[in-house]
Amino acid sequence: MLTSGLTNAPITKLLLIYTIASSIALSILDIKHLASIHVSPHLWPYAQFWRLATWQLAGFTNSTEALFAAMLAYHLRVVERAWGKRKFATFIISTLPYTSLLPPLLLVLLRPLTLYKLNYLPCGPTATLFALLAQYHAGIPHTFRYRISTSTSTSTSSANRDTDASGRGEGAQGKHLTLLLSDKSTTYLVAAQLALSQFPGMMLPAAVGWVVGVAWRAEVLPVPSARWRVPAWAVGEKEMGRRGTQGGEGGERYEDLRRRLEGEAVAAAAAASGNAGSASEASGQRQRRREGGIMDRLRAL
């Protein structure tokens, strides 16, 4: 059964609230001009390189982008439920240097190739959201599929409408267009709206975020320590005792899952034993009734 809302997704809830709150703060404080990046003049000649570290953390400059980003973050909550909040937070933090630094650096390189027309990088956590979208695309299966079919029929009107059915059916010829969609299609539609909101500036962080997410999943993204994880206390979890071996770390990592599976196994065994007990009791009652019927017949004889 699907869980509604943001249940069991505290990091996604925090990301959603931060996206909306930071976008509102940009408007209230009237500091939108400090959030985005223009290669000229912000980086050259003003040398405002601090924008490379703040453009993704500043929020969005208009309500449309903030709305689509919040909707996309809400759809991506299933990734946190599948991974757990510790791995989810680790992914965001470990990919943050790449999603923050690569888009402006690529913008600097692409600017001369586009005859200095590509000069603007919109602010907001677009790259992080699309890195999460890559995990959603690769790791979350669809629940259902549906088809949308359209048809354009051209029928030839007959001179006499009282003719037989064979004469009327000859003119009916149709062209069909069928689209096969799934429950994940709405998520991709929201992501496309966000990527195309400030074309072509928003396309760059969206593409970089997707590539970073795919590279992280393929384990080709250079990270300082592949075994590093966010501390358990940072996400509200308790640190389990370490056993000092690799197997001990694996047991610590999946301790919660093991306890959950054990609880489900105990509940299933109890239900099975209850069903078996009720079935044996019912069979005993039927046997006693059968024996009682035989004794009554013998007494009648």
Curated annotation (Swiss-Prot):
Mutant lacking the gene: phenotype: Impairs growth on solid media under hypoxia and leads to triazole susceptibility. Impairs virulence in a murine model of invasive pulmonary aspergillosis (IPA).
Instruction: Name the segments for region: Disordered.
Output: 268-301
Pathway it belongs to? Protein modification; protein ubiquitination
Q: Which domain of life is it from?
A: Eukaryota
Ranges of biased composition (kind: Low complexity)? 268-284
The membrane-topology field of this record reads: Multi-pass membrane protein
Report the EC code(s) recorded for this entry. 2.3.2.27
Reaction(s) catalysed by this chain's protein: S-ubiquitinyl-[E2 ubiquitin-conjugating enzyme]-L-cysteine + [acceptor protein]-L-lysine = [E2 ubiquitin-conjugating enzyme]-L-cysteine + N(6)-ubiquitinyl-[acceptor protein]-L-lysine
Mostly located where?
A: endoplasmic reticulum
Enzyme class, top EC level, equals: transferase
* Basic and acidic residues bias: start-end ranges: 290-301
Give the transmembrane ranges.
9-29, 52-72, 90-110
UniProtKB keywords: Endoplasmic reticulum, Membrane, Transferase, Transmembrane, Transmembrane helix, Ubl conjugation pathway
Listed GO molecular functions? transferase activity
Annotated Gene Ontology cellular component terms: endoplasmic reticulum membrane
Places the protein is found: Endoplasmic reticulum membrane
* Quaternary organization: Component of the DSC E3 ubiquitin ligase complex composed of dscA, dscB, dscC and dscD.
What is the role of this chain?
Answer: Component of the DSC E3 ubiquitin ligase complex which is required for the srbA transcriptional activator proteolytic cleavage to release the soluble transcription factor from the membrane in low oxygen or sterol conditions. Required for growth during hypoxia and triazole drug susceptibility, as well as for virulence in a murine model of invasive pulmonary aspergillosis (IPA).
The name under which this protein is listed is DSC E3 ubiquitin ligase complex subunit B
Q: What is the lineage of its organism?
A: Eukaryota, Fungi, Dikarya, Ascomycota, Pezizomycotina
